[in-house]
């Protein structure tokens, strides 16, 4: 089963400017993500960027770059441009790996691609079981519920499903497992263009969750439990220091 990994790497970041080029153990962050994707067994790994500085860094370590428009409103629009520019066939599987996850486990990149290939959905993603009670009620931790066949029923920043009896108690203990969505997606390449040509849905605008557009228009998203929980991504200088510390310990 062949698949291509696309890694969006925007230079601009309000909380951490120049994030893709941030040094981690002597390598830019984007190179860490690229190397993890290569270990997953991808046929091709493409860095999608709108900045020449990122492009130059990628070329220096031997990676492949696709220059994209700086005007995209979403990561999926950037993917659509890559698919068009690189003439990727409609039935080919694309895995979108975030450029700020330098420690993403290769096994889950492969897993989400395999899951899509084995399903009849146009899109697949992964989730992990929530273990922290704080996370259950944190709107930044996106929850997902799936049906018995593993297809998403809904994604929400709210606590779903709401465990009525247990959450009525003062300690609100986690008795029944809840699933937190993790932001890795696999798509059939032709579906990406279909997606970006749909008008945004009311639900995705309310929740600020792009994936709800797929469910709104009646398509399916396959969801499975990740074989390995990914480390946190890098959004802030504090996150970057935490990842540097992890890498230094492994060295």
Curated annotation (Swiss-Prot):
Domain of life: Bacteria
Keyword Cytoplasm attached: yes
Protein name: 3-deoxy-manno-octulosonate cytidylyltransferase
InterPro entries: Cytidylyl_trans (IPR003329), KdsB (IPR004528), Nucleotide-diphossugar_trans (IPR029044)
Enzyme class: transferase
Protein localization: Cytoplasm
Principal subcellular localization: cytoplasm
The family this protein is said to belong to: Belongs to the KdsB family.
Keyword Transit peptide: no
Function description: Activates KDO (a required 8-carbon sugar) for incorporation into bacterial lipopolysaccharide in Gram-negative bacteria.
Metabolic or biological pathway: Nucleotide-sugar biosynthesis; CMP-3-deoxy-D-manno-octulosonate biosynthesis; CMP-3-deoxy-D-manno-octulosonate from 3-deoxy-D-manno-octulosonate and CTP: step 1/1; Bacterial outer membrane biogenesis; lipopolysaccharide biosynthesis
Entry keyword set: Cytoplasm, Lipopolysaccharide biosynthesis, Nucleotidyltransferase, Transferase
EC identifiers of the protein: 2.7.7.38
GO CC, alphabetical: cytosol
The organism of origin for this protein: Vibrio parahaemolyticus serotype O3:K6 (strain RIMD 2210633)
A Pfam family the protein falls into: CTP_transf_3
Gene Ontology biological-process entries: CMP-keto-3-deoxy-D-manno-octulosonic acid biosynthetic process; lipopolysaccharide biosynthetic process
Catalytic reactions on record: 3-deoxy-alpha-D-manno-oct-2-ulosonate + CTP = CMP-3-deoxy-beta-D-manno-octulosonate + diphosphate
HAMAP family: KdsB (MF_00057)
Any one GO molecular-function label of the UniProt entry: 3-deoxy-manno-octulosonate cytidylyltransferase activity
Gene expressing this chain: kdsB
């Amino acid at each position: 089963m062949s698949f291509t990994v696309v890694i969006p790497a925007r230079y601009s970041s309000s909380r951490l400017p120049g994030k893709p080029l941030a040094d981690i153990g002597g390598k830019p962050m984007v190179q860490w993500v690229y190397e993890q994707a290569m270990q997953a067994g991808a046929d091709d790994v493409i860095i999608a960027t709108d900045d020449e500085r990122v492009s130059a860094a990628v070329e220096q370590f031997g990676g492949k770059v696709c220059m994209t428009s700086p005007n995209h409103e979403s990561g999926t629009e950037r993917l659509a441009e890559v698919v068009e520019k690189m003439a990727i066939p409609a039935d080919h599987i694309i895995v979108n790996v975030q450029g700020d996850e330098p420690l993403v486990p290769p096994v889950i990149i492969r897993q989400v691609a395999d899951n899509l290939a084995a399903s009849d959905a146009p899109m697949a993603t992964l989730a992990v079981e929530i273990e922290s009670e704080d996370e259950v009620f944190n709107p930044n931790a996106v929850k997902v519920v799936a049906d018995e066949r593993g297809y998403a029923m809904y994604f929400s920043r709210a606590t779903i499903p709401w465990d009525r009896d247990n959450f009525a108690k003062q300690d609100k203990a986690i008795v029944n497992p809840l699933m937190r969505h993790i932001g890795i997606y696999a798509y059939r390449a032709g579906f990406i263009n279909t997606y970006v040509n749909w008008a945004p849905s009311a639900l995705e605008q309310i929740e600020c969750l792009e994936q709800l557009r797929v469910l709104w228009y009646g398509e399916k998203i396959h969801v499975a439990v990740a074989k390995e929980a990914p480390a946190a991504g890098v959004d802030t200088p504090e996150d970057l220091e935490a990842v540097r510390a992890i890498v230094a310990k492994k060295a």
